[in-house]
Amino acid sequence: MRSIIADSKRLVVKVGSSLVTNDGKGLDHAAIGRWAAQIAALRAQGKEVVLVSSGAIAEGMQRLGWSKRPREIDELQAAAAVGQMGLAQVYESRFTEHDIRTAQILLTHADLADRERYLNARSTMLTLLRLGVVPIINENDTVVTDEIKFGDNDTLGALVANLIEGDALIILTDQSGLFTADPRKDPNATLVAEANAGAPELEAMAGGAGSSLGRGGMLTKILAAKRAAHSGANTVIASGRETDVLVRLAAGEAIGTQLIARTARMAARKQWMADHLQVRGHVVIDAGAVEKLTAGGKSLLPIGVIDVQGAFARGEVIACVGPDGREVARGLTNYSSAETKLIHRKPSGEIESVLGYMLEPELIHRDNLVLV
């Protein structure tokens, strides 16, 4: 089996905390130097590389003299602020040895949820790649809360892959890849060499927590691969402990688990909607509406809405949830939550009599709706 990385030109490489730190005692300068050398080798082959790197909080902990990762959000943010300085400095120093410029980009999920900021981030990253710069990306943990508490850089890597239409996402971890069961508990567990991204059985196989320094277990990596497939990006999950793992993957050697994007690439606008990690509200729709959306490719009409939850404005992305509580779609709503509460369960012909006006006959037009 040949590695999919060999034929991939634009790569997003995610490196976990345990691969750039000395077991929590600050940054491992030698390890970062090796990553810089490998990325320089890939660049020499004509590949474009965006690096998503963890390590800021771990570095901040070391600089502040903390031996355990704090639980309080304000302390995590303080550690991130202190550590981000060191992380950027070390990467810049190591890449300069290969005559490569770097750029620091700190993102939040809110940056990618806003359409204008999303497009600006995309334009900036593509310009940096065109200029031969290696963008080094991390979540802006200093100003966010939910991302520190629940987020992970695996997801961020997938979002970046979608943002720049990357060919592949490489998630480097301290594990060898995805196994059929937890190899620490089951001696019969075997490595999954290749599978389809988004295959339901993968989530059942994945489990277990990540290291104490990082936040992402194997499940987050599987879900990141599923998300990256939205833009047609394949994913490789491999051990960063393997010598020259990036160079060997680029040479075609099969290492770890590769997850292939089999689904059709989403249109850019629909991809942006699908990549919303948080939505302001959702509508519960009946079984008939679920069928029309999923099988018929129809628009969502107010009559198909059972309930309205959350507060949202016209033009925002909302989720569509079936009677069983499962999200089936999301899209840009033509009406606010207050308006939707007045017109739900009503035929489109009655919208004007209820509201005094009719903006659109659909709550969400099919052109602004994406299945999830």
Curated annotation (Swiss-Prot):
Summarizing the function annotation, the protein's role is:
Catalyzes the transfer of a phosphate group to glutamate to form L-glutamate 5-phosphate.
Check the record and name the PROSITE patterns matching this protein.
Answer: GLUTAMATE_5_KINASE, PUA
Residue positions annotated to bind substrate are S54, D141, N153
| Predominant place of localization | cytoplasm
Annotated protein name in UniProt: Glutamate 5-kinase
In its UniProt record, a GO molecular function of this protein is: RNA binding
- Where the record annotates domain PUA, the positions are 280-358
Q: In which pathway does it act?
A: Amino-acid biosynthesis; L-proline biosynthesis; L-glutamate 5-semialdehyde from L-glutamate: step 1/2
Q: Which family does it belong to?
A: Belongs to the glutamate 5-kinase family.
The Enzyme Commission number assigned here is 2.7.2.11
Q: Which reaction equation describes what this protein catalyses? A: L-glutamate + ATP = L-glutamyl 5-phosphate + ADP
Per the UniProt record, the source organism is Burkholderia lata (strain ATCC 17760 / DSM 23089 / LMG 22485 / NCIMB 9086 / R18194 / 383)
- Which HAMAP family has this protein been placed in? ProB
At the top level of its lineage, which domain of life is listed? Bacteria
